[in-house]
Amino acid sequence: MSSSETFYWHDYETSGADATLDRPWQFAGVRTNAALEIIGEPLTLYARPTPDRLPHPAAIRVTGITPQLAAERGLPEVAFIARIHQELAQPKTCGIGYNSIRFDDEITRFALWRSLRDPYGREWQNGNSRWDLLDVTRAYRALRPAGIEWPVREDGFTSFRLEDLTAANGIEHGAAHDAMADVVATIEIAKLLRRCDENLFDTLHRQRTKRAVSALVNLDELTPLVHVSGMFGGARHNLALVVPVAWHPTNNSDLICVDLGKSPDFLEQPTDIVRQYLFTPQAELPEGVERPPIKTIRLNRAPVLLPTQWVAGGVAESLGLDGDLHRRHLSLLREARAADQAGFMTRFQSLWQAQSFPERSD
């Protein structure tokens, strides 16, 4: 990270959990330098509720922000998001939070859209980028857990809730679900992670952009990569070895991959059957049928993708990764590729070419 680049740590409290429809009621943000030292004035804003969207009662209970409080302290949404955009759009800013790419960034995008502003430009123009500490934290738990206290849920798996991590590691958090308290707590977690393994922190930071992570992809050799994602679940340490097999046919930010921890039995099945099982909701799959181990990774969402060297030296064993099994599955995929050089990639791409989505009602 160059000396001129900065992180802008931020968090929203909202009227509900649907980022596409629910509204931001509180925002907090603060800027740090590359050393995670605060260099700007903290910013806290409220937005007035809008009459076209009722708040969810659970959101009021969790955040403690009532419609009356938001109305009293809040700005009109257009002024609210304009002030936020002013910070996030500063050149060479990396917007970051905890679960920010999946939630907070979507809140920002939709608020900008409702205000007739460009929803995306601030994420990539003028040397800007975005990052998310949640998957970084998952990567540390799997790959470099030493030096950090990892809270455990009732089901025996690690809790990645921000308030649980701060409590376990003696980090002051103030009032959880207060936007500024969450921002400060996130910065302190980042400092802890970096102290424990600066190399992993800096590596993940360098590879947060689409261009950087694309450089790891080798479709010609079918080179496997380490992928960390909450989609794999606690039983798998939120990690899998995957092999990129094709680019999405219509979205060049999406990479089609196969999970090497699962058998590639789908290679023997007709494409229409594979497609049916791939996009059928889990609860509706026939008994005894597993979803094909094929997924897309969105490279413009700062995914954690690393070379397999990161699971060398006993790390794979600690994660329960069966090297022989993974090599066997990779060999089957490479054999299928060698048998049909032209059709191998096309077959994966065709799974998404006929994809349809149910209509969404109001």
How should each PLM-predicted stretch be described?
Residues L21-F27, R31-I65, Q86-N199, L204:
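Metal-dependent phosphoesterase core characteristic of DEDDh/y 3'-5' exonuclease domains
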Residues N251-L330:
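Extended alpha-helical coiled-coil/bundle linker/stalk regions that scaffold oligomerization
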Residues R206-A283:
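Acidic catalytic cores of enzymes that act on phosphate-bearing nucleotides/polynucleotides
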